[in-house]
Amino acid sequence: MAQVQYYGTGRRKHSVARVRLVPGDGNIVINGRSLDEYFGLETLKLIVKQPLVETGTEGQYDVRVNVDGGGFTGQAGAIRHGIARALLQVDPEYRPSLKSAGFLTRDARMKERKKYGLKAARRAPQFSKR
């Protein structure tokens, strides 16, 4: 008998997370490592768990994640986005609560490119009057 699985893809900055939800006891595995092992900061762990807490499904599903690209914050945001999308497949009734919390919206903010003549995206070289 095939096990029921729910999929969701999340993105944030340059990170892409492929999330798989499987009925279980709440284990979160990211790239073969546990949540505590993968993310050192407590805030990042909370970000990842937010959609599960919002829908009251914490401890009901095992979360398997394959995340690629970006830094830790971007990856945590991408995982949150992916889990929220996967939860929609579990039960479409979760949509209003996830939507109002903002977990279904792809955060479109990206790093602004560096411009020539400037030191960074907007930082200009020091100006000397004399």
UniProtKB/Swiss-Prot annotation:
Q: Known SUPFAM superfamilies for this protein?
A: Ribosomal protein S5 domain 2-like (SSF54211)
| InterPro entries cross-referenced by the UniProt entry | Ribosomal_Su5_D2-typ_SF (IPR020568), Ribosomal_uS9 (IPR000754), Ribosomal_uS9_bac/plastid (IPR023035), Ribosomal_uS9_CS (IPR020574), Ribsml_uS5_D2-typ_fold_subgr (IPR014721)
- Which biological process, per GO, is one annotated for this protein? translation
Judging by the UniProt lineage, the source's domain of life is: Bacteria
Q: Name one Pfam family in it.
A: Ribosomal_S9
The residues the entry assigns to the signal sequence are none
UniProt keyword Ribonucleoprotein present: yes
Task: Provide the family line.
Answer: Belongs to the universal ribosomal protein uS9 family.
Per its record, how is this protein called by name? Small ribosomal subunit protein uS9
Q: Which organism is it from?
A: Halalkalibacterium halodurans (strain ATCC BAA-125 / DSM 18197 / FERM 7344 / JCM 9153 / C-125)
